[in-house]
From Swiss-Prot:
Function: Together with its co-chaperonin GroES, plays an essential role in assisting protein folding. The GroEL-GroES system forms a nano-cage that allows encapsulation of the non-native substrate proteins and provides a physical environment optimized to promote and accelerate protein folding.
Compartment list: Cytoplasm
Keywords: ATP-binding, Chaperone, Cytoplasm, Isomerase, Nucleotide-binding
Name of the protein described by the UniProt record: Chaperonin GroEL
Lineage: Bacteria, Pseudomonadati, Pseudomonadota, Alphaproteobacteria, Acetobacterales
Organism: Gluconobacter oxydans (strain 621H)
Length: 543
């Protein structure tokens, strides 16, 4: 086991604070509408330009092990806030730095770190309640667009696009962000259920120009296993031909004789047919086939439940208004399923989302719910260069998360004003002892840090701006850093989601409190590598 370095007390906290400052100073230049960009070097390809706090934080790794520990703890604040709220990472970093700085001073002055932490926790609880009580619920598309615009750094086009997407797919719909091939950013909404599997053979195509298969009012056979022979299916195929409607087969795979027979029948015009592989893998595939069956009013043909292909009738097949099949995607439009069954299935998936502990599973379940209940929208982000597209994509991601958070928990005035005003809730607060009172005071000072930093990044004096904002009693009165004016922030559309502000403060206080109470640090001692031996002389060389 390698030897360890151990640092204690003030020495440990000083090293840690140095790391915190390096990371926080790099992140906080991005805060606010006039925040600057940070350029990140990449081991291959062009450098990446970003204004996203968490992307900057994730890139920072320091040479000194003890400084790095401090930096990584603050990085954790940014990551946690990003995971929960999806935005507010820079605000969380600024708050954490302010709490740790003030806390370190108090500990150096001889105060009890545990009491300081208790005071910080109590004050944060009161501030969170104050934020919740001053929250305004948002409902109109205009307000949703305002939240998106603020988070996208003042780009109205992005805000409006997100509001439009949310309107079309509903609160349970899925909105994804992708890179576009062209210059323009566009919104693409998929109506109906789409999954990422296309036709098994290009011979099923009905539109050779676009290479797609479009089938109107088809029957849908949902089969769990592989189809290699059509013999068991012949009675069913006869019934489908007599009905005069197309047939879509969704199965694990269709190959061999079965595929050849279907293709020949399609080419001769005897049967309008297409075959698609089932989406997903393993248990998730079973669940997705069940979703398709409920959406289309059909049954999954599976030997597990005792249904064999020979005994399948037309009543067991699903139906839809239209199915559109591309090389890599299939879309089912207006499935003929019973609406009560679909609602029941949605409630079942919602219950699974509540219970699951895995982020990956939760994401997949939400996708399934969206396909059944809402819809899927894709925002394709365009730009002139790859660097620009990546930078815009970061901002669209942030804006999307902020908008979702705003719909979920409501909004408060933006620009760091809500946190600064929440400090008034701490005025009459009583603590058990003086050290805890100082903990409350640390939070009160830290609450002004985001407002001061936004003003500083806009070229103003942070202390003067904070003083002027707090002099005015109006809750929505604040500083518009973009225009350099004092105004009613909510009316001007400068708003923050309550969830983002709350999460940023709670995460910052959690890590800040832990760092203040640190008394010792242990890190591996770097090994001194011996210099390489000089190469020996070659034979016949005159040394």
């Amino acid at each position: 086991m390698a030897a360890k370095d151990v640092k204690f007390g003030a020495d440990a906290r000083e090293r840690m604070l140095r790391g915190v400052d390096i990371l926080a100073n790099a992140v906080k230049v991005t805060l606010g509408p006039k925040g600057r960009n940070v350029v990140l070097d990449k081991s291959f390809g062009a450098p990446r330009i970003t204004k996203d706090g968490v992307s900057v934080a994730k890139e920072i790794e320091l040479a000194d092990k003890f400084e790095n520990m401090g930096a990584q703890m603050v990085r954790e604040v940014a990551s946690k806030t990003n995971d929960i709220a999806g935005d507010g990472t820079t605000t969380a970093t600024v708050l954490a730095q302010a709490i740790i700085r003030e806390g370190a001073k108090a500990v150096a002055a001889g105060m009890n770190p545990m009491d300081l932490k208790r005071g910080i926790d109590k004050a944060v609880g009161v501030v969170v309640d104050q934020l919740k009580s001053n929250t305004k619920k948002i409902t109109s598309p205009e307000e949703i667009a305002q939240v998106g615009t603020i988070s996208a750094n003042g780009e109205t086009e992005i805000g409006e696009m997100i509001a439009s997407a949310m309107q079309k797919v509903g609160s349970e719909g899925v909105i994804t962000v992708e890179e576009a091939k062209g210059l323009h950013t566009e919104l693409d909404v998929v109506e109906g259920m789409q999954f990422d599997r296309g036709y098994i053979s290009p011979y099923f195509v009905t539109n050779p120009e676009k290479m797609t298969a479009d089938l109107d009012s088809p029957y849908i056979l949902i089969h769990e296993k592989k189809l290699s022979s059509l013999q068991p299916m012949l009675p069913l195929l006869e019934s489908v031909v007599q009905s005069g409607r197309p047939l879509v087969i969704i199965a694990e795979d269709v190959d061999g004789e079965a595929l050849a027979t279907l293709v020949v029948n399609k080419l001769r015009g005897g049967l309008k047919i297409a075959a698609v592989k089932a989406p997903g893998f393993g248990d998730r595939r079973k669940a997705m086939l069940e979703d398709i069956a409920i959406l289309t009013g059909g049954q999954v043909i599976s030997e597990d439940i005792g249904i064999k292909l020979e005994s399948v009738t037309l009543e067991m097949l699903g139906r839809a208004k239209k199915i559109h099949i591309e090389k890599e995607n299939t879309t089912i439009v207006e499935g003929a399923g019973n609406s009560d069954d679909i609602k029941g299935r949605c409630n079942q998936i919602r219950a699974q989302i509540e219970e699951t502990t895995s982020d990956y599973d939760r994401e997949k379940l939400q996708e399934r719910l969206a396909k059944l209940a809402g819809g899927v929208a894709v925002i394709r982000v365009g730009g002139s260069t790859e660097v620009e597209v990546k930078e815009r994509k970061d901002r669209v991601d942030d804006a999307l998360h902020a908008t979702r958070a705003a719909v979920e928990e409501g909004i408060v005035p933006g620009g760091g004003t809500a946190l600064a005003r929440a400090s008034s809730a701490l005025k009459g607060l009583t603590f058990d002892n003086d050290d805890q009172r100082v903990g409350g005071e640390i939070v009160r000072k830290a609450l002004q840090a985001p407002l001061r930093q936004i003003a500083f990044n806009a070229g103003e004096d942070g202390a003067v701006i904070a003083g002027k904002v707090l002099e005015n009693e109006g809750y929505v009165f604040g500083f518009d850093a973009q225009k350099g004016e004092y105004k009613d922030l909510v009316a001007a559309g400068i708003i923050d989601p309550t969830k983002v502000v709350r999460t940023a403060l709670q995460d910052a206080a959690s890590v800040g409190g832990l760092l203040i109470t640190t008394e010792a640090m242990v890190a591996e001692r770097p090994e001194k590598k011996a210099p390489a031996a000089a190469p020996g002389g070659m034979g016949d060389m005159d040394f």
